[in-house]
Amino acid sequence: MAVKWTGGHSSPILCLNASQEGLVASGAEGGDLVVWGEDGTLLGHTCFQGAEDVTNVLFSPSCPTKLYASHGETISILDVRSLKEPLDDFHVNEEEINCLSLNETENLLASADDSGTIKILDLENKKISRSLKRHSNICSSVAFRPQRPQSLVSCGLDMQVMLWNLRKARPLWITNLQEDETEEMESPQSPGQLLNPALAHSVSVASCGNVFSCGAEDGKVRIFRVMGVKCEQELGFKGHSLGVSQVCFLRESYLLLTGGNDGKIKLWDVSSEIEKKHKSPTKHTHRKKTKRAAYTKQGGGTHASVTGEDEHGKILPKLSIEHGEKVNWLLSTKIKGYRNILVADQTSCISVYPLKEF
């Protein structure tokens, strides 16, 4: 069963982030932002003026007390030791912000919004350095690539995934998930796909910087590799029976967490699929070879395979949790030395699941 962190929010939690020191921040509907200790104790709370939903929170890696938060069309920078007044506010987006991403050198902050625009904020000069406009619908997720501070990936409800280099105002590469269904997908296009189009909800880049994942409304998880100025789809599989709301690579590995509107949380090891095509291991990838099967029980239990594939070569999750609520946000972080999964859903509490096997 999951441990529940309660008492911080009274409305559904939309986003989570963790600092390197073990602090956790959560943002909720109605403008609420809470900072927690690693044992779930409430350390701080604020409610932004205007009571607009807090859609993203992001700790600064270099300054663990600094926190970025998006609410409505505003980005606020806060000191977690004193949340009452923001250190700075930026009004750079014209519509509600859905996602924030900080580059590795921490001089640029990307904010993706409902208009489909990605604004690039120069944090040193406190001004917009780029405005990236190519998505024709809501831009739901954006992520800078590790080790490449001028490069990012984005996805949106226009079913498009894009690769950007900030030296150019237009994307280097675009794919339409609905049009680009390949033979790699396990099943041919079915009438159900018209009911569940491949609206893209979430992207996550692995620590190597070259491999990224995208989760979409059609229930599929897609893995791409950046090949210079373009990308290739390495893998695509049906991960959830309903839309994939969250994808999240664990640090320094090709272990991928996914969360869905079907109330399930799954952990996949996609390393073997990636390494089949690229024999040399990717830089900065440290993978533990585990043969242990995970456990299974209802209501926060798991079901997993010992190996990553069944007899038909179909990829299987290493871990499957019956969470029971639509997943709004997933986070993997170490708490007291052990890796855990933190989950935000339609409730006002955070669920914490141990991930000791991995």
From Swiss-Prot:
Residues 278-294 have a biased composition (Basic residues). Keywords: Repeat, WD repeat. This is WD repeat-containing protein 53. PROSITE patterns: WD_REPEATS_1, WD_REPEATS_2, WD_REPEATS_REGION. WD repeats lie at residues 8-46, 92-131, 134-174, 195-234, 239-278. Gene3D superfamilies: YVTN repeat-like/Quinoprotein amine dehydrogenase. The gene is WDR53. Disulfide bonds: none annotated. Residues 278-309 are annotated as: Disordered. It holds the Pfam family ANAPC4_WD40. The keyword Repeat applies. InterPro entries: Apc4-like_WD40_dom, WD40/YVTN_repeat-like_dom_sf, WD40_repeat_CS, WD40_repeat_dom_sf, WD40_rpt, WDR53. Belongs to the WD repeat WDR53 family.
